[in-house]
Amino acid sequence: MTVKLVLASKSPFRSALLKNAGIEFSTASADIDERAVEAPLYESGATPEDVAQILAEAKAIDVSEKNPGAVVIGCDQTLSLGDEIFHKPHDMEAARRQLQKFSGKTHQLNSAVVLARDGKTLWRHVSIAHMTMRDLDAGFIGRYLGRVGDIALSNVGAYQVEGPGIQLFEKIDGDYFTIVGLPLLPLLAELRREKCIDG
C-alpha cells in the first residue's frame, strides 16, 4: 500500500493498538485547544457523542492539512454520567471525587474515530460503551488510587480497564477497543475500503 497513514495522537496506547494490528503509520499532534472547541458545543446542547466526534474530526483535519495526501486518523473519547461530562482528573482529589460519583452507577464512554485527507473528512464513526461500577467505599477508592498512582490522572474516569481499574466494575456493555478509546474494528474495515491497508 502506498497511502501514508498518520495517527493524530501522541497516545502511546493508541499507537500500540495500531502497531499490534500490523498497521504502518506515523504520529503527529493536532494543534487545537480541545476545551475551547468543546465549550460552545456543550452550551448549544451537543451530546457527548457529538463532542467526541467533532473533536476527533478537528484533530484529523488539522493534521491532514499539514500532511498533504496522507490519510489521517483522529480520535477522541468523552465520558458522561447523565448530563455531566468528565475529563481527565487534574489531581488525586479530583480522581477520588470522580470515582465516588461513578460508584454504583452506569456511565457512558463515547469513542470517536475520523479519517481525513487534505483537510476533508473521509469517514467518521462513534462507538459507545456502558460502564457500570460496583459500589465503592471510600477506603477502597483510596487504596485503589494509592496503588495506581498517576495512571489515574492520565485517563478520563481515573481508571484503565486493562489494569487494576477493571476491579472497579460490576458490568461492562461495549467493545474493548471502544472502552480504551479507539474503535479499532470499524477503523480497520474503513481503512480496507479506502485501500489504505491490505485486505
Curated annotation (Swiss-Prot):
Which Pfam families does this entry report, sorted A to Z? Maf (PF02545)
Positions of the record's site feature: Important for substrate specificity: 13, 77, 162
Subcellular compartments: Cytoplasm
Any single biological process term in GO:
nucleotide metabolic process
Q: Which InterPro entries match?
A: ITPase-like_fam, Maf-like
State if Hydrolase is listed as a keyword: yes
What NCBIfam families does the record tag this protein with? maf, PRK02478.1
**Which family does the UniProt entry place this protein in?**
Belongs to the Maf family. YceF subfamily.
Protein name as catalogued: 7-methyl-GTP pyrophosphatase
Q: What is the lineage of its organism?
A: Bacteria, Pseudomonadati, Pseudomonadota, Alphaproteobacteria, Hyphomicrobiales
